[in-house]
Amino acid sequence: MAVYTKVYDSYAQAESSVRDLEAAGIPSADISLIANKYVSEQYADVSDVSATSTGAGLGTAVGGGAGFLAGVGLLAIPGLGPVVAAGWFAATLVGAAAGAATGGLIGALVDAGTAEPDAHVYSEAVRRGGTLLTVRTNAASAVQIDGILNRYQPIDPAVRRREYEQTGWREFDPAAKPYTPSQAELDRIRRR
């Protein structure tokens, strides 16, 4: 099974992709989303954040934008803080967080087939307010899924890496503090 991973600058872009994937018959069980907690506060009624800063577990959340996101969990990931986590990849990430030596989000992305340099960019993009979307698929659906995911302008990891490097960034640092909503918005404005 192939895994497609994209990061969007806004939750709305990712949500549109999820809706189109579901409309195309992609099972919700094969779709996963990870976004900063502040995004969840805009789109879901977050009722509890019980995960620790080391990524030890899931909290609870109620509501959600896209249908499959109802009942999403909150997961604390080093360098990202609390994130909204829904779907199969979130479960993979919980396992990676429990065995901290596996590398957290970067390790989970690499294990799912993402090149390590791109995994660093994707992790940094989520830290800065982006939304990560992963989809599992068989070969028969690959072209369709790729088209849907690219429809809503996901980031280009090579371009984004160059933008980040212009500010002195080299790779994702799990010890770095997560961006606040205002920092994330300023970062988006700077890149426009």
For every predicted segment, state its role.
Residues 1-192:
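Intrinsically disordered, low-complexity, hydrophilic segments
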